[in-house]
Regions:
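Metal-centered catalytic cores of metalloenzymes
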Residues: 21-76, 80-179
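N-terminal secretory signal peptides that target proteins for export/translocation
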Residues: 1-3
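Bacterial N-terminal signal peptides
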Residues: 8-21
């Protein structure tokens, strides 16, 4: 009887740990480092940025962008497209965004849900967008008056580890600040 109990206990732990691991991967952070040389065609700019995307549940995506060298972005969007390719807008991140000016640029935060998805993602779910993000099929673009088709851009990718504590960072000259 004791060995049967131990077997059931071990199986229960394996199932629980497996469920936690699957959940961690499903809701892992997505990140993007934005630069002018990733824009298609590339642009010359000192602006840079870092974006972090988290989805605390299957219907909501939260985001934070730290942008240096741009004070007033005109548009910030998630697009469909692999590295080196332009694509359609999937989400207008400025629609629900809050902007906070910094000494070197702006911090943009917000969230969206499935009703905010447009273009090829219209009618789909946030998890469908997450699948595209995991596949490397999405990028973030920040447009300005000077560069209306994109001043900085970055492919969205899965953070190094689902359990890692990803911080947003901005490199300014030789200094890096994190938040």
């Amino acid at each position: 009887m004791t060995s049967r109990f131990m077997l059931l206990l071990i199986l229960g732990l394996v199932v629980t740990v497996g469920a936690i691991s699957i959940s961690d991967v499903a809701f892992a952070k997505k990140i993007a480092s934005l630069t002018g040389d990733q824009v298609v065609p590339p642009v010359s700019t000192d602006a840079i940025g870092h974006a972090t995307f988290k989805h605390p549940n299957s219907s909501t995506m939260n985001y934070k962008l730290n942008i240096s060298g741009i004070v007033h972005p005109d548009k910030i969007d998630i697009h469909a497209g692999k590295t080196g390719k332009n694509g359609e807008v999937l989400v207008d991140l400025m629609k629900h965004a809050k902007q906070q000016a910094t000494k070197v640029g702006v911090i943009v935060t917000g969230s969206f849900n499935a009703s905010d998805l447009i273009g090829p993602m219209q009618g789909k779910t946030v998890l469908d967008l997450v699948d595209s993000m995991k596949s490397g099929d999405t990028y973030v673009s920040v447009d300005t008056q000077k560069h209306p088709t994109g001043e900085i851009r970055g492919q969205i990718e899965l953070a190094n580890s689902p359990s890692s504590n990803v911080t947003s960072s901005i490199k300014v000259g030789n200094n890096t600040s994190t938040s």
